[in-house]
Amino acid sequence: VGIRAFSSDLISASSYLRDYVEKGGNLVTQYNRTDDAWDSQTTPPRPIKIGSPSFRWRITDPNAEVHYLVPDHHLLNKPNKINQNDWKGWQQERGLYFVDEAAENYQKLLSMADPGKKPLDGALISGKIGNGWHHHCCLILHYQLEHQVPGAARLLANLITPADWK
């Protein structure tokens, strides 16, 4: 589900998306603003609170160092092993509208910081929900893809690949 896609029309599909994940689906959602139709309790399959005010929940330095919080997680390893080279050449910024809090199903996978600021760890989260997975990505992948940043394409491939892919 693309950036800021949760409008009033798509909100009505939240229960369908939740059911899809619980039955084994792989759902990828991208960033949403707190003033979009995103309800932290009912829009995602399990609660996810977006940080507010939004200007404090973003990484504006496209060269900010990225740390792996769960390095063996499948999103960082299949089908592509995501490494520090994948963060080179990023344009504009790393991401925005980061997650502040999430249900215990979710793991926060990355940490990064703007110069002189505290690290944020809500850029990429992943949770096992029933028989499926929900990944919420606040990185600006669409912008990186427009600028042909290979690491963004590699990470996107990982996001859409089922967890049991061999």
Regions found by a protein language model. Name each.
Residues 1-8, 140-141:
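The substrate-binding groove and active-site-proximal loops of carbohydrate-active enzymes
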Residues 5-91, 149-151, 155-157, 161:
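A glycine-rich, often tryptophan-bearing local segment used as a flexible ligand/cofactor-contacting loop or short
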